[in-house]
């Protein structure tokens, strides 16, 4: 909800490409978070469908992030047709695998869990980990673009660097969730994006745009 609420603020950016990128990140992440929340609220077969739609929204966040990072750092990858077509092909291929999961079950399966509360637990399969690995690699490419920009900037970008670091915290929680039953095994990335968005849009907006 925080990401969706921040969209009007992002729409005020003058640079059209940066505006499209950050709005895309906020929209995709907001939908991702909403579907994740809905997954724990509803019950029955619809829960699996909601989780599936959330997965697609989450993967879409990666591509919106790359578009934003390319535009914000002054690169042109987001304008190149070959890059656009290749990105679309990869995205659609992964979406197809996710949509057909009810048939092959290689992306995830479900089971009833009772700890720390009763919910429909997700057991991730091989395809999930492959796509998750790809997502982390692509996200890291975007992070590299930002860190390189801030490193070469004449401005004091330390607060912005800290904000970027917030994006990595949920990854630590994701890993911890694999090792302890006290944490639900879901992707916590939307929390990091929400923290980053609040920081760049409401706390350090001028510095963010000045760089």
Where are the language model's segments positioned?
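First transmembrane helix
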Residues: 1-14, 23-27, 132-150, 196-204
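Individual alpha-helical transmembrane segments in multi-pass integral membrane proteins
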Residues: 1-2, 12-104, 129-132, 186-193
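Interfacial "cap-and-anchor" motif at the non-cytosolic start of specific transmembrane alpha-helices
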Residues: 4-5, 33-34, 38, 147, ...
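Juxtamembrane membrane-water interface segments of multi-pass membrane proteins
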Residues: 9-15, 72-80, 144-159, 208-210
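Hydrophobic alpha-helical membrane-embedded or membrane-associated segments
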Residues: 24-28, 59-62, 136, 140, ...
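Transmembrane helix-loop junctions in multipass membrane proteins, especially transporters and channels
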Residues: 41-45, 73-76, 102-110, 150-157, ...
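Hydrophobic, aromatic-rich alpha-helical transmembrane segments
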Residues: 48, 52, 125-126, 156-160
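Extracellular-loop-to-transmembrane junctions of the mid-late helices
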Residues: 94-144, 176-186
